Amino acid sequence: MTTSALRRQVKNIVHNYSEAEIKVREATSNDPWGPPSSLMSEIADLTFNTVAFTEVMGMLWRRLNDSGKNWRHVYKALTLLDYLLKTGSERVAHQCRENLYTIQTLKDFQYIDRDGKDQGVNVREKVKQVMALLKDEERLRQERTHALKTKERMALEGIGIGSGQLGFSRRYGEDYSRSRGSPSSYNSSSSSPRYTSDLEQARPQTSGEEELQLQLALAMSREEAEKPVPPASHRDEDLQLQLALRLSRQEHEKEVRSWQGDGSPMANGAGAVVHHQRDREPEREERKEEEKLKTSQSSILDLADIFVPALAPPSTHCSADPWDIPGFRPNTEASGSSWGPSADPWSPIPSGTVLSRSQPWDLTPMLSSSEPWGRTPVLPAGPPTTDPWALNSPHHKLPSTGADPWGASLETSDTPGGASTFDPFAKPPESTETKEGLEQALPSGKPSSPVELDLFGDPSPSSKQNGTKEPDALDLGILGEALTQPSKEARACRTPESFLGPSASSLVNLDSLVKAPQVAKTRNPFLTGLSAPSPTNPFGAGEPGRPTLNQMRTGSPALGLAGGPVGAPLGSMTYSASLPLPLSSVPAGLTLPASVSVFPQAGAFAPQPLLPTPSSAGPRPPPPQTGTNPFL
């Protein structure tokens, strides 16, 4: 006997439970196995008794309301209730419908054990079965009929069995009951047919039952087969992926073999379709190449239509350009085209060749175009040429002469189109017109300026040519006159009345108070337009000459060094070691020329005395010795 069974027996004695209540407690115990069918059959027989029915149902409702940790009590109570609904009294179903709310609340029963397993699932599933049976009266009636028939058959089978088999069944029932410590083991002699094993009850007794069980098994297997296929697992997905990769690899290998041609096994295989496809492969390749060629040609032609004109028939001239394409000479277009005719400035143009339009980014054709080291060809009049950057007017003509930035102006004959060209890198043509232009433009043997500028020679006077004096390249006199003489329009624009109105007439005109400086007449071209220096010092003109220290000592009436004679004797003034040597003591041979009047007067900038005067400082020093050394 286990500890739990011993504890239950002690509780049964203490609480004085009846025989029906003890059997219900035994069937709904907390043991880890289900209730025995023999014990449930005894409880079902007790439900037909009114007193026992009350005791059975009372203990059963108490077990259904147990706590979560005793979930086995609840589960076994539901199992016993299901059995009583099928084999017990009809009053069991009526009382369950009256207390339907108590059973329905068990749908939310939950309990998770220490291992994290939800044990409430079993209770919730059992509640659903009981509720479905209670709500469907027709099904309940059928279940009761089938259960009663099975019970009667089992009872008749137990009575008709021989004494040997009956003894075996009795001993098996007694051992089965005693192994569980059931109190019904003491009454095994009176109820021996009821204690047959579950295996004996499940085994078919007649051929009809066996046929019925066979059909039931077939139906169950058919239901299992008709169930929908569950989704493939990750392993199945990996297998499918590998299969797809294998198939794609095989298809790729087949394509490679088909492109290889005779080297593939398909070339030797049997099949007219394969050979036909292989024969058509070169045709497809040729067709693809033709399409590619057409596409490339069309794109090149589109670019040529945009940037290059239509091709012209090959000309008969021979080009000296090593990069020139023979036969590629575009036709000329009308003068109204936005891309004017031009020629390559780097290739020589032979005589007798008609100028034709070239690429739009080339330079315009030049009449005197040639290589710097070659001979200048003479070009006949050709078709009219148009400058793409010039005006499109037919009456507009460019200047016929082009300016050479490094040489004299050259004269060129105009083309019929009126455009003149100039090559800055070409050799000047040796025509009569060019020579005349050079003779007119270049300076002649006679000087053309008042003073001919020669870096290594003396200036020579110039003469007039054609009765007029030619301007000098370095003469800035014209520019000085233009700068020093403002225009009348500028004066008119700066009058006060122009921006202040009539009220400005009362203002003082400062221009009338200040006189304009007179322009000095000089022959120096670099000082043209600049005022000459003043002959006198503007800073010392209005100030009287200050007496020097030596003049104050000697009491001389002279006020400054500038007023005294230049050749005064050296002994007329005393010498002080702390003062600079006066200009009057400088010898006459070292004096500056009289024409230099830029320096200010010496008396105006004489330094202040740094030592006290002789009257306050002490005795007078002896006079210095006279000599010719200006530094003593």
Curated annotation (Swiss-Prot):
Keywords, sorted A to Z: Cytoplasm, Cytoplasmic vesicle, Lipid-binding, Nucleus, Phosphoprotein, Repeat
Species assigned in the record: Homo sapiens (Human)
Tissue and organ distribution: Detected in migrating keratinocytes from wounded skin, but not in differentiating keratinocytes or in normal skin. Detected in chronic wounds, basal cell carcinoma and ulcerative colitis.
Domain UIM: 209-228, 236-255
GO aspect biological process, one term: endocytosis
Keyword Nucleus: yes
Domain of life from the UniProt record: Eukaryota
Boundaries of every ENTH domain copy: 12-144
GO molecular function (one): clathrin binding
Gene: EPN3
Family: Belongs to the epsin family.
PANTHER family in the record: EPSIN-3 (PTHR12276:SF16), EPSIN/ENT-RELATED (PTHR12276)
InterPro entries hit by this protein: ENTH, ENTH_VHS, UIM_dom
Region (3 X 3 AA repeats of N-P-F): 524-631
Biased composition (Basic and acidic residues): 276-294
CDD domains in alphabetical order: ENTH_Epsin (cd16990)
A Pfam family matched in the record: UIM
Annotated binding of a 1,2-diacyl-sn-glycero-3-phospho-(1D-myo-inositol-4,5-bisphosphate), by residue: R8, K11, R25, N30, R63, H73
Compositionally biased spans, kind Polar residues: 353-371
Name of the molecule in the record: Epsin-3
Induction: In keratinocytes, by wounding or contact with collagen.
Gene3D superfamilies reported in the protein's UniProt record: 1.25.40.90
Biased composition (Low complexity): 179-196
